[in-house]
């Protein structure tokens, strides 16, 4: 096993522990707490994959961080912060909407790369809006935290979430996954809309109805599916 992989996991475990202590003092805001929960799932998945104990890794990560901080000057810290690109966290959903449990009458699930797509195929003839919480860098979607599909009544009928055991995805991965979700929901005569925030950063264009323009690959796939059903 690569030593950098192990040490990276150890440092991530310790930094998560620090953030958890911060949250325990009721100092974290909603985006902070949301990332904390997501990262906990990711660390559990990585620990299982690597065969490493999280508690032991946390202690080792603390030693690594302490060694770095001993050599770190205030001036070097300022220069590091100044060189980082600005990262923004955008939220369409409230904390309650993100953490709410939901179930499907006719579940369908598909894994696309490192993203898991889930939808309820029992939903028909509804108006549905897609909302997402995600980070943006250089005016492009950088990391999807969670996307959910809501009916006008507020019921959750679909979801796209990163797989904890497979971290990392691109904005194109997200775009393609949303195309799959939209295609599945529209198949049952639902009308799907996308939030303005998601349109702005996940797509550069949309049609007049507020529906995103699907990527060419997704268009071809949906066209073939439609033709086969006629």
UniProtKB/Swiss-Prot annotation:
Motif residue range(s): Nuclear export signal: 137-146
Alphabetized UniProt keyword annotations: Eukaryotic host gene expression shutoff by virus, Host cytoplasm, Host gene expression shutoff by virus, Host mRNA suppression by virus, Host nucleus, Host-virus interaction, Inhibition of host innate immune response by virus, Inhibition of host interferon signaling pathway by virus, Inhibition of host PKR by virus, Inhibition of host pre-mRNA processing by virus, Inhibition of host RIG-I by virus, Inhibition of host RLR pathway by virus, Interferon antiviral system evasion, RNA-binding, Ubl conjugation, Viral immunoevasion
Motif (Nuclear localization signal): 34-38
Described purpose of this protein according to its UniProt entry: Inhibits post-transcriptional processing of cellular pre-mRNA, by binding and inhibiting two cellular proteins that are required for the 3'-end processing of cellular pre-mRNAs: the 30 kDa cleavage and polyadenylation specificity factor/CPSF4 and the poly(A)-binding protein 2/PABPN1. In turn, unprocessed 3' end pre-mRNAs accumulate in the host nucleus and are no longer exported to the cytoplasm. Cellular protein synthesis is thereby shut off very early after virus infection.
Single Gene Ontology MF annotation: RNA binding
Pfam families reported for this sequence: Flu_NS1 (PF00600)
Entry coiled-coil feature ranges: none
Family in the record: Belongs to the influenza A viruses NS1 family.
Organism expressing this protein natively: Influenza A virus (strain A/Chicken/Hong Kong/37.4/2002 H5N1 genotype X2)
GO cellular component, one term: host cell nucleus
Region feature (RNA-binding and homodimerization): 1-73
Record has Ubl conjugation as a keyword: yes
Chain residue ranges for the region called CPSF4-binding: 180-215
Subcellular location: Host nucleus; Host cytoplasm
Name the UniProt record assigns to this protein: Non-structural protein 1
Swiss-Prot/TrEMBL GO biological process terms: symbiont-mediated suppression of host cytoplasmic pattern recognition receptor signaling pathway via inhibition of RIG-I activity; symbiont-mediated suppression of host gene expression; symbiont-mediated suppression of host mRNA processing; symbiont-mediated suppression of host PKR/eIFalpha signaling; symbiont-mediated suppression of host type I interferon-mediated signaling pathway
Region (PABPN1-binding): 223-230
Phylogenetic placement of the source organism: Viruses, Riboviria, Orthornavirae, Negarnaviricota, Polyploviricotina
């Amino acid at each position: 096993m690569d030593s950098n992989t192990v040490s990276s996991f150890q440092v991530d475990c310790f930094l998560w522990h620090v953030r958890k202590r911060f949250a325990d003092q009721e100092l974290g805001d909603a985006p902070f707490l949301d990332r904390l929960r997501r990262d906990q799932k990711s660390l559990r998945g990585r620990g299982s994959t690597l065969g490493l104990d999280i508690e032991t890794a946390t202690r080792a990560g603390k030693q690594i961080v302490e060694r770095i901080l001993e050599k770190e000057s205030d001036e070097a810290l300022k220069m590091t912060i100044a060189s980082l690109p600005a990262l923004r966290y955008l939220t369409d959903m409230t904390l309650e909407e993100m953490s709410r449990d939901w179930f499907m009458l006719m579940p369908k699930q598909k894994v696309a790369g490192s993203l898991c797509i889930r939808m309820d195929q029992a939903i028909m003839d509804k108006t549905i809006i897609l909302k997402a919480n995600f980070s943006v860098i250089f005016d492009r979607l950088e990391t999807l935290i969670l996307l959910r599909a809501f009916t006008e009544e507020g019921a959750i009928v679909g979801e796209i979430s990163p797989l904890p055991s497979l971290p990392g995805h691109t904005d194109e991965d997200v775009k393609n996954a949303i195309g799959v979700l939209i295609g599945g929901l529209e198949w049952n005569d639902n009308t799907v809309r996308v939030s303005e925030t998601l349109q702005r950063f996940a797509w550069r264009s949309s049609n007049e109805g507020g529906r995103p323009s699907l990527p060419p690959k997704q268009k071809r796939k949906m066209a073939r599916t439609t033709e086969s059903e006629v």
